[in-house]
């Protein structure tokens, strides 16, 4: 029988991977090779998902701001330009929250942007 020189390390690695694969269906939670492939894929997808989440939220905020500004008679790009010219430094997340929760305050911001664009 061949000598195994890395039994402790291999066992430790296998246990770690199988622990991460707990709850997966069938062989993906029982067999090391398939479990390892599934865990690697899952970790990669979760990493990518964390990066995509930032993009997705920014797109959502911009869509909300755009909808609210068009209700008040202005486009998103002109609104953002007017806000910057007015020296109002509010990020898109806060602007979208204001647009949803306080329509009157958002309408006031749109008016400020319109004045700056006309000036």
UniProtKB/Swiss-Prot annotation:
Stored Gene3D superfamilies: 6.10.160.10, Ribosomal protein L20
PROSITE patterns, per the entry: RIBOSOMAL_L20
Classification via Pfam families: Ribosomal_L20
Keywords for the protein's UniProt record, in alphabetical order: Ribonucleoprotein, Ribosomal protein, RNA-binding, rRNA-binding
CDD domains per UniProt: Ribosomal_L20
Gene Ontology CC: one annotated term: ribonucleoprotein complex
Molecular-function GO terms, alphabetical: rRNA binding; structural constituent of ribosome
GO biological process, one term: ribosomal large subunit assembly
Record-stated family: Belongs to the bacterial ribosomal protein bL20 family.
Role, per record: Binds directly to 23S ribosomal RNA and is necessary for the in vitro assembly process of the 50S ribosomal subunit. It is not involved in the protein synthesizing functions of that subunit.
Record-linked NCBIfam families: rplT_bact
Name of the protein this chain belongs to: Large ribosomal subunit protein bL20
Organism: Clostridium botulinum (strain Eklund 17B / Type B)
Protein's gene: rplT
């Amino acid at each position: 029988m061949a000598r195994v020189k890395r039994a402790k390390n291999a066992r430790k690695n296998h246990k770690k991977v199988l622990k991460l694969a707990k709850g997966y269906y069938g062989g993906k939670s029982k067999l090391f090779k398939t479990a390892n492939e599934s865990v690697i894929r899952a970790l990669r997808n979760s990493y990518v998902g964390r990066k995509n989440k930032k993009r997705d939220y920014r797109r959502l905020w911009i869509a909300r701001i755009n909808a609210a500004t068009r209700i008040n008679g202005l486009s998103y790009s002109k609104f953002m330009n007017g806000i910057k010219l007015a020296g109002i430094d509010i990020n898109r997340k806060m602007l979208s929250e204001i647009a949803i929760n306080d329509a009157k305050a958002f309408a006031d911001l749109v008016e400020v942007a319109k004045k700056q664009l006309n000036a």
